[in-house]
Amino acid sequence: MSLWKKTVYRSLCLALALLVAVTVFQRSLTPGQFLQEPPPPTLEPQKAQKPNGQLVNPNNFWKNPKDVAAPTPMASQGPQAWDVTTTNCSANINLTHQPWFQVLEPQFRQFLFYRHCRYFPMLLNHPEKCRGDVYLLVVVKSVITQHDRREAIRQTWGRERQSAGGGRGAVRTLFLLGTASKQEERTHYQQLLAYEDRLYGDILQWGFLDTFFNLTLKEIHFLKWLDIYCPHVPFIFKGDDDVFVNPTNLLEFLADRQPQENLFVGDVLQHARPIRRKDNKYYIPGALYGKASYPPYAGGGGFLMAGSLARRLHHACDTLELYPIDDVFLGMCLEVLGVQPTAHEGFKTFGISRNRNSRMNKEPCFFRAMLVVHKLLPPELLAMWGLVHSNLTCSRKLQVL
């Protein structure tokens, strides 16, 4: 072989060896190292759950459950981000053949048609709310059209604090919303909400309609969100947007409590019966709930719970079919865990006095002693807040803590 041919041959071999070495080196790197950015996460389609806790396809919700393989240890840790990105859930038309279903009122038929649609995409999210040392997360159920209520809360009891006092962490506030229930209003209110969220950065919103029966969706969406983004927050206060809250009393009450406790405190209703009168807002037909009474549950307005219990509550709720009354549904979830909610005199679901005309319902000295009072509209809330935090002299101090 001539010298020229030998030189060309050696050059080709060297180039081939270099190419193989570069290929091996590239394959040894992870995509994130090579591209300087992590690969996008693989999103699994969201599934609904039957009462026994087995995962099933939403379209097979009413069919017999099939055996499900045990989740891997990695899957049991739960998602690291909100993992529902699309809404693809059709009505369960199999119900139309059931005689008991055919006699139900339209709103209950609509609820049952889509009861298996459990989770929806997030439209507005603020995972940063739980970064750092957060002691108390204040969460308020609101409706997209009720900006005035959210604004009044931000100016009063929903004002955030850098410290809860006594070496405790921050107090942060979030509002929970769906979308406008009237289609013709949806675009307009969504634009206003986007501007509001740019101003305050305190709104969690999901892609379901804000209706009375969908308040239960708001409960389970928040619990799932909490499980993902707030794994270490010690305590949560959850309330409506028409209540008066005394944050000082809430924090004083929590001072001696431990986050590991089964703490669930509010105005607890025992042995409450389902309402069968069709003209009542809380009417429930026997076909939907046939028992004589509900499990104990905290009535409307607000309640306090430990963060560790809230995360267990998320998984307990996922073993039950949805129920159209959100407070009762949470009571059912607590029953699954074997946890009894605790009654406290500082939580007033029906005002300080059940007699709406009573002067007690407008007496600031009573409000100063309470934790939560339901219900007040924005002008009443602002006025009462000003009175409670004025140089008020009360003849005697109520002891409710």
Swiss-Prot record:
Residues 35-62 are annotated as: Disordered. Its EC number is 2.4.1.-. One of its GO terms (molecular function) is acetylglucosaminyltransferase activity. Its main location: Golgi. One of its GO terms (cellular component) is Golgi membrane. One of its GO terms (biological process) is O-glycan processing. The chain crosses the membrane at residues 7-26. Residues 49-62 have a biased composition (Polar residues). Expressed in corneal epithelial cells. Pathway: Protein modification; protein glycosylation. Residues 27-401 are lumenal. Glycans are attached at N88, N94, N214, N391. This is UDP-GlcNAc:betaGal beta-1,3-N-acetylglucosaminyltransferase 7. The lineage of its organism: Eukaryota, Metazoa, Chordata, Craniata, Vertebrata.
